């Protein structure tokens, strides 16, 4: 009789089985963070647009 052994464990790629879900979650978090930052910039521009433009021009537009 042949002796067969089975090893139960993970394959090299198995530990990242849920990676697409994680990547989607991280992408959404990054997008939300970017949206929040843009909203904050919009708010600053609405309240201090003239000052923002003045300081931007003083720095040479860079």
Curated annotation (Swiss-Prot):
- Report what the Swiss-Prot or TrEMBL entry states about this protein's PTMs: Is modified by deamidation of its C-terminal glutamine to glutamate by the deamidase Dop, a prerequisite to the subsequent pupylation process.
Using the UniProt annotation, give all residue ranges assigned to the region (Disordered): 1-36
- Which GO terms label this protein's molecular function in UniProt? proteasome binding; protein tag activity
The region called ARC ATPase binding is annotated at 18-56
Q: Which UniProt keywords apply?
A: Isopeptide bond, Ubl conjugation pathway
Give residue numbers for the modification (Deamidated glutamine).
62
* InterPro entries, A to Z: Ubiquitin-like_Pup
Q: Name one GO biological process term.
A: proteasomal protein catabolic process
Its pathway, per UniProt, is: Protein degradation; proteasomal Pup-dependent pathway
Crosslink position(s): Isoglutamyl lysine isopeptide (Gln-Lys) (interchain with K-? in acceptor proteins): 62
Domain of life of the organism in this record?
Bacteria
Which family is it part of? Belongs to the prokaryotic ubiquitin-like protein family.
> Domain note for this entry?
The N-terminal unstructured half of Pup provides a signal required to initiate unfolding and degradation by the proteasome but is not needed for pupylation, while the C-terminal helical half of Pup interacts with ARC to target proteins to the proteasome.
Q: What does this protein do?
A: Protein modifier that is covalently attached to lysine residues of substrate proteins, thereby targeting them for proteasomal degradation. The tagging system is termed pupylation.
Subunit-level organization:
Strongly interacts with the proteasome-associated ATPase ARC through a hydrophobic interface; the interacting region of Pup lies in its C-terminal half. There is one Pup binding site per ARC hexamer ring.
- What protein is this chain from? Prokaryotic ubiquitin-like protein Pup
Please tell me the species this chain comes from: Corynebacterium kroppenstedtii (strain DSM 44385 / JCM 11950 / CIP 105744 / CCUG 35717)
């Amino acid at each position: 009789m042949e002796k067969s052994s089975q090893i139960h464990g993970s394959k090299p790629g198995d530990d990242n089985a849920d990676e697409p879900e994680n990547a989607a979650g991280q992408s959404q978090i990054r997008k939300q963070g970017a949206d929040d930052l843009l909203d904050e910039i919009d708010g600053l521009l609405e309240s201090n647009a003239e000052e923002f433009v003045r300081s931007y021009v003083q720095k040479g537009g860079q």
